[in-house]
């Protein structure tokens, strides 16, 4: 399922991400704000267990998450999305995937994988600001499926139709939460209008 999340604050912060004059610190802050809002949407239907809790005055019914959440940022730009989420639950763990797309081809290189122990009872959320050709995300999903999590979702900021269509065709049960669906990919496979290289803008590199 593709879910473009409609929210005034997302549009406000997305404009900052797109602006070429936005500073590195401003870019980080805007990325955090959008990631938080997308995370709320991605998790609002998570299964809950009923528990009894005692307030200072009485016992009452409460709820807790049934399953852990495992965040898997795709290095390096996905690393900038972690802090926006980890503060929301003590049931959040973090794995890492190192994958990059070769600029002149559609092939991808996987160079690092480190996952929490036993994620078979967890909901995995892949974090990557950009969904361009879809090849990086397909590689990530394939790798994570080897660990047999309950569910895989994706939080991305901006996506191109080409990448969305490719991933949805291969993995229709993976939910993808987005702030924007842009026009197209250019000849160099960058998203247009996009927001530039998210990793460079996030970390102040070129």
Curated annotation (Swiss-Prot):
It comes from Mycoplasma genitalium (strain ATCC 33530 / DSM 19775 / NCTC 10195 / G37) (Mycoplasmoides genitalium). GO terms for cellular component: cytoplasm. Pathway: Pyrimidine metabolism; UMP biosynthesis via salvage pathway; UMP from uracil: step 1/1. This is Uracil phosphoribosyltransferase. InterPro entries: PRibTrfase_dom, PRTase-like, Upp_B, UPRTase/APRTase, Ura_phspho_trans. Its cofactor is Mg(2+). 5-phospho-alpha-D-ribose 1-diphosphate binds at residues 76, 101, 128-136, 197. One of its GO terms (biological process) is UMP salvage. Its EC number is 2.4.2.9. Catalyzes the conversion of uracil and 5-phospho-alpha-D-ribose 1-diphosphate (PRPP) to UMP and diphosphate. Keywords: Allosteric enzyme, Glycosyltransferase, GTP-binding, Magnesium, Nucleotide-binding, Transferase. Belongs to the UPRTase family. It catalyses: UMP + diphosphate = 5-phospho-alpha-D-ribose 1-diphosphate + uracil. PANTHER family: ADENINE PHOSPHORIBOSYLTRANSFERASE, URACIL PHOSPHORIBOSYLTRANSFERASE, CHLOROPLASTIC. One of its GO terms (molecular function) is magnesium ion binding. The keyword Magnesium applies. It is an enzyme of class 2 (transferase). CDD domains: PRTases_typeI. Allosterically activated by GTP.
């Amino acid at each position: 399922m593709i879910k473009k999340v409609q929210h005034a604050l997302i549009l406000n912060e997305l404009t900052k991400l797109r602006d070429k004059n936005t500073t590195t610190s401003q870019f980080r802050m805007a990325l955090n704000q959008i990631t938080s809002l997308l995370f709320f949407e991605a998790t609002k239907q998570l299964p809950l267990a009923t528990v009894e809790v005692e307030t200072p005055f009485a016992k009452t019914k409460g709820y807790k998450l049934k399953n852990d959440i495992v965040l898997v940022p795709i290095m390096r730009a996905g690393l900038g999305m972690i802090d926006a989420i980890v503060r929301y639950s003590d049931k959040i763990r973090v794995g890492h995937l190192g994958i990059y797309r070769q600029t002149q081809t559609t092939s991808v290189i996987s160079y690092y994988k480190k996952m929490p122990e036993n994620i078979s009872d967890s909901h995995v959320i892949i974090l990557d600001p950009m969904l361009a050709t879809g090849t990086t995300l397909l590689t990530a999903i394939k790798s994570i499926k080897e660990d047999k999590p309950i569910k895989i979702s994706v939080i991305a900021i901006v996506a191109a139709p080409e990448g969305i269509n490719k991933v949805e065709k291969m993995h229709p049960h993976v939910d993808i939460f987005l702030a924007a669906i842009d026009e197209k990919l250019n000849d160099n496979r960058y998203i247009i209008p996009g927001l530039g290289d998210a990793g460079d803008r996030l970390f102040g590199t070129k």
